[in-house]
């Protein structure tokens, strides 16, 4: 973490947030968390930043392992407390970025974390098989919380908020239509 901090300071001559990259316990080549480079802010598309042996800049980052210099905390405070489970890390890192602080992931793994997340396709298949009642319960769960998701969008990308609200409504009530539209978005 500290060598990445020095790398970032040498590049920008200012404090940076450094996200330590955890890898899967059983597969050290599988990154479980890290940073994201945004491809299209309005559409909400991005790519996970990969470890290359040197720190990589990103647009938003997870906080499983996160080094935040004290001067950044003095300016931004700590994480927003309005979230149940998810999005506080993205929210904080994007707020830091907007204030001019660079974000980096480390060039090498800094820890282990089991990769237990579904791919987008796996989640799609699962949701399409669910009943309406099951989908509502799924999106009330803290890990998939509609409340957290919409709060995050409202705080990080307010121009997207009305579209994301419609998208979440479609994902719950008309998932087939939602995924058809989602695949078109992914191809843009």
Task: Identify the function of each model-found stretch.
Residues 1-36, 102:
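Conserved donor NDP-sugar-binding/catalytic core segment of glycosyltransferases
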Residues 102-130:
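Active-site donor/metal-binding and catalytic loop motifs
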